[in-house]
């Protein structure tokens, strides 16, 4: 990790050189092979530019911008600087967590930190860019109700979803729905009365991330998945996620403010480890347990914001 930060050029050269760096990490060249394969999932296992662009740059940029606006509203000086620094620190921790066995710097880490993470912070500090994504593309980040297990400290029900509701010309009651993460869902959003939106998408997600211990090259196994979301004016009320991913067959989240003013709940079903249930509160820690051989008490990682009903 330190080599990637302090010796980025050397890390790129050790990972195959500049050609591999541009071809696999930045440019969407793999899309051509995917199309030629008639959209075979196996040909999409190394399109690292996709999570780099949507996850690191756009999602990271939106997160930084939102944090900056929150800090600014609270009168914190140098809000953009603090928000950008916090976002980059989180990106470094994420790289350390996802690459625990690597002993040398990699071109992938260099790309994510210096090109996409930093680029997203800078890009979304521009008001015109932030306004375009918020008001034209209707981009938002919807998160699961992340929880910590006690006493193991395991992180459970943790996921961020970058979603878009893209306008359809001459259609006022529906939009094109796009959910991006490591995988992707494409579908439609139906605009209901009272500011409610119902979004349905289908696509694929990653079952397992494979990292070459020498080069740091990342590939993934792709599995089918689908999702359903209910929100009101962008505030997520409930979500349902189904997939063939072993560790996340079914996930249900009902957020605080949907059925109860302060409490929310979630359910996670896995292929081999039974299921887990959790309870959250918008302003205080809660707990949960599951009647299975792998049941543990769960505590929300942070208070959930109140959903606007």
Where are these regions (language model features)?
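Interfacial helix-loop-helix junctions of multi-pass membrane proteins
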Residues: 90-114
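Short loop/turn motifs that connect adjacent beta-strands in outer-membrane beta-barrel proteins
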Residues: 72-82, 126-143, 258-259, 290-294, ...
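Transmembrane beta-strand segments that form the barrel wall of outer-membrane beta-barrel proteins
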Residues: 176, 262-268
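Long, repeat-rich segments with strong aromatic
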Residues: 167-254
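Outer-membrane beta-barrel "beta-signal"
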Residues: 271-309
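Membrane-interfacial alpha-helical segments at the cytosolic side of multi-pass membrane proteins
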Residues: 58-74, 114-130, 286-290
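Transmembrane beta-barrel domains of Gram-negative outer membranes and organellar outer membranes
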Residues: 1-74, 214-216, 222-236, 244-248
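Extended amphipathic alpha-helical segments with heptad-repeat/coiled-coil character used for oligomerization
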Residues: 109-159
């Amino acid at each position: 990790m330190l080599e990637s930060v302090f010796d980025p050029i050397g890390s790129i050269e050790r990972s195959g050189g500049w050609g591999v760096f541009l071809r696999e990490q930045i440019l969407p060249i793999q899309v051509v092979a995917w199309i030629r394969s008639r959209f075979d999932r196996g040909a999409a296992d190394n399109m690292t530019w996709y999570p780099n662009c949507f996850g690191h740059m756009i999602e990271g940029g939106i997160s930084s911008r939102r944090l900056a606006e929150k800090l600014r509203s609270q009168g914190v000086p140098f809000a953009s600087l603090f928000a950008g620094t916090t976002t980059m620190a989180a990106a470094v921790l994420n790289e350390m967590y996802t690459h625990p066995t690597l002993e040398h710097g990699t071109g992938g880490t260099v790309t994510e930190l210096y090109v996409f993470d930093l680029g997203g912070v800078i890009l979304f500090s521009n008001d015109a860019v932030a306004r375009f994504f918020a008001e034209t593309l209707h981009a938002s980040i919807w998160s699961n109700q992340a929880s910590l297990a006690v006493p193991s400290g395991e992180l459970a029900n943790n996921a961020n979803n970058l979603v878009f509701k893209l306008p359809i010309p001459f259609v006022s009651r529906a939009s094109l729905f796009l959910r991006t993460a490591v995988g992707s869902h494409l579908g439609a959003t139906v605009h209901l009365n009272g500011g409610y939106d119902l979004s349905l998408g289908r696509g694929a997600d990653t079952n397992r991330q494979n990292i070459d211990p020498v080069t740091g090259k990342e590939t993934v196994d792709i599995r089918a998945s689908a999702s359903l979301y209910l929100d009101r004016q962008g505030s997520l009320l409930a979500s349902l996620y189904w997939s063939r991913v072993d560790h996340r067959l079914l996930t249900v989240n009902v957020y605080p403010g949907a059925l109860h003013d302060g409490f929310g709940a979630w359910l996670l079903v896995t292929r081999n480890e039974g299921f887990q249930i959790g309870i959250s509160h918008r302003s205080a820690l809660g707990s949960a347990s599951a009647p299975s051989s792998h049941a543990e008490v769960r505590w929300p990682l942070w208070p959930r914001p109140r959903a606007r009903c």
